[in-house]
Amino acid sequence: MDGDGVQEGGRQFSWSGQGPGEVAIAGPALDMRMLSNGEASLLLNYRLDEKPSGLTRLAIGCGPGCSGTLDLTPTLSQATPGEWRSVKVKLSCFRDAGADVSRVSEPFVLNTSGRLRLSLTTVQLSSDPAGAICPPR
């Protein structure tokens, strides 16, 4: 898939609405306390291909039963389908929503039970606070 001006630069994810599903990045636990105390954020470059039909959550996972989960539905619902956009979510918002940022094992989790089709080119940490948001829980 070509994404954001880069050939084969993105991945498309689809949820059918037939039950819960998620996409995540997982690895060894990281201590992100310093990042969450500062102005760091999680940056997503995305194209909405089909608007969400249900609650869509963005989370940071910190082990079994541990996460900080935010409602990304309003942000995605405002996007124009087919248009590339960026969103930055403050790491402190995930901490305030319950994530133990001293042991982050999933720095990106996106889940929904509804229909959704979304393409991503970038999922990364950003130190630039400009435009960063804190979605509702």
Where are these predicted regions, by residue range?
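Activation corresponds to long, low-complexity, non-globular regions
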Residues: 131-137
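Internal, hydrophobic beta-strand segments that form the core of beta-sheet-rich folds
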Residues: 104-114
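Extracellular glycan-recognition surfaces and repeat-rich motifs
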Residues: 1-12
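Short, surface-exposed loop/turn motifs at beta-strand boundaries within globular domains
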Residues: 6-8, 35-39, 103
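Extracellular ligand-binding interfaces
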Residues: 13-97, 114-131
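Noncatalytic modules at the cell exterior or secretory-pathway interfaces
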Residues: 96-106
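Short, hydrophobic/proline-enriched secondary-structure or compact coil segments at domain edges
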Residues: 10-15, 106-108
